[in-house]
Amino acid sequence: MEIIRLPAFNDNYIFLLVDRATGDCAVVDPGDAKVVLEYLSKEDLTLKTILITHHHADHVGGNRQLLSHFPAAAVYGSEIDLQKRRIPGQTVSLKAGNHLDLFNRTVEILFVPGHTQGHIAYYFPPLQPEDSGDLFCGDTLFANGCGRLLEGTPAQLFASLQQICDLPDNTNIWCAHEYTLKNIKFSLTVDPENEALQRRFQQVQTQRQRQKPTIPTVLALEKQTNPFLRCSDRQLQANLKTTDPLRVFTKLRGKRDLF
């Protein structure tokens, strides 16, 4: 399976999962149908599957147009979003623990509420022990950040991020926005002593100056530099004047909202 990253809007990423042997593909969170259709036409690919992490327009806005070109494509999303009819064209309901088979890969469904109540993520475990898995997590975990609390509670999003932390450290994190540089600038205000974070800031500055994407990130790097995954770190707790990890997380999210 080949993963193609398609930029959309100002800072979104849409991901195509391509089986070159068959010419079939899936798309994750197609907020903009135009960029997807252009790539499919250029590469002569057939869209079979639409995977949605959550219902926001910049993640589902292209569904109807894609289905007009590929009416047989299945649209996957959470059971909560299906109940609320929030995902255009949704045909399949998913919940925590469900599994899919896609291009000879198993896909595990994680329920990761917080940003929205129905948010899910798609985890592709590695085929071989030495390989890396892939997580498509929408707006739950970002490179050096996390999603805003638009429908859920701090405790929900904190628990969702802990789920992600339980995945193997070499997991590739395919999040849906290019927010990395601003996230790192914020992180430095709350975790300035973090040398790994300082190094990452220099690297990401260079990448963005060259208009290079910073996605995917890797879970191990997030555990070293992302304050939202470091709420048990003693230095970060001292900086935020609390030893309660959930309270650290809640303070971080509030500060990031105002940054």
UniProtKB/Swiss-Prot annotation:
Cofactor list: Zn(2+)
GO molecular function: hydroxyacylglutathione hydrolase activity; metal ion binding
EC numbers on record: 3.1.2.6
Record Gene3D superfamilies: Ribonuclease Z/Hydroxyacylglutathione hydrolase-like
Residue numbers binding Zn(2+) 2: 58-59, 139, 177
Swiss-Prot/TrEMBL keywords: Hydrolase, Metal-binding, Zinc
One Pfam family linked to the record: Lactamase_B
Reaction(s) catalysed (UniProt annotation): an S-(2-hydroxyacyl)glutathione + H2O = a 2-hydroxy carboxylate + glutathione + H(+)
Listed GO biological process terms: methylglyoxal catabolic process to D-lactate via S-lactoyl-glutathione
Cited function: Thiolesterase that catalyzes the hydrolysis of S-D-lactoyl-glutathione to form glutathione and D-lactic acid.
Quaternary structure note: Monomer.
Protein name (database record): Hydroxyacylglutathione hydrolase
Origin species: Picosynechococcus sp. (strain ATCC 27264 / PCC 7002 / PR-6)
Lineage: Bacteria, Bacillati, Cyanobacteriota, Cyanophyceae, Oscillatoriophycideae
